[in-house]
Amino acid sequence: MQLMVVSGRSGSGKSVALRVLEDLGYYCVDNLPVTLLPQFISTVENNEQDIAVSIDVRNMPSESGVIQKTLNSLDDKLDINVIFIDADDKELVKRYSETRRLHPLSKHDMSLEQAIQSESAIVADIKEHADLVIDTTNKSIHDLSETVRARVLGRESRKLILVFESFGFKHGLPTDADYVFDVRFLPNPHWVPELKPQTGLDQEVKEFLVGHAEVNKLIYQIRNFIETWLPLLEKNNRSYLTVAIGCTGGQHRSVYVAQQLADHFLHDGQQVQIRHRTLESK
């Protein structure tokens, strides 16, 4: 039986994630106090149905470590996965301003900005222990739904899922990455006029990059790093390993390198997901 714990800052998209899990057949409970989790599990464990519960700031224990201790106390047969949904402060302020809803902590005589910052400290403990952090800053409801669906369905094999994503440094670092590799020192197809409008998925750009020894050497070294430590990472009960590859704009070099790595590990029999952040945003 799987137990999905969904948490995150208010306004980030927890309710959307929970609805996706419900659509996938999970028995869902919204805003369950952490202290009631063991009792709740004991009442439904014979149903043989996967469970998802959401925990928000209103039900967070005041003492740090309580959530992790509670999860550790549950039946070893449970496959527990914690998903944390988040967005940057400016985006959360924007969402609350557009919907005109009150933040759960606003009733404590705080401004919206203060409430959002205060919530960050309260939920920091569960975020630190999350198996997956999803940043919804630049995601639509549809994007978030597809991300949750892909990650959850991908976990059915119970193997660690390798997630490769390309990005552009000028658009900011991805917050969900476990490892970030900077490939801005590689030869740049951007400066070749006929290659400038293309991407790292196009054949001419591939031929340009594969023709440079340093590109091939870097891909080999990143691949070797992952292959060396993957067995230990799998033993650490991780659900995902997210490797981000960044170049200046996220169009050529990072796309090519991320795709090459994804293709290699997919061919090697690993569970792989690939995302090109800049290309998907266009």
Curated annotation (Swiss-Prot):
It comes from the Bacteria. GTP binds at D56, V57, R58, N59. InterPro entries: P-loop_NTPase, RapZ-like, RapZ-like_N, RapZ_C. Gene3D superfamilies: P-loop containing nucleotide triphosphate hydrolases. Displays ATPase and GTPase activities. It comes from Photobacterium profundum (strain SS9). It holds the Pfam family PapZ_C. Belongs to the RapZ-like family. One of its GO terms (molecular function) is ATP binding. ATP binds at G8, R9, S10, G11, S12, G13, K14, S15. This is Nucleotide-binding protein PBPRA3258. Keywords: ATP-binding, GTP-binding, Nucleotide-binding. HAMAP family: RapZ_like (MF_00636). SUPFAM superfamilies: P-loop containing nucleoside triphosphate hydrolases (SSF52540).
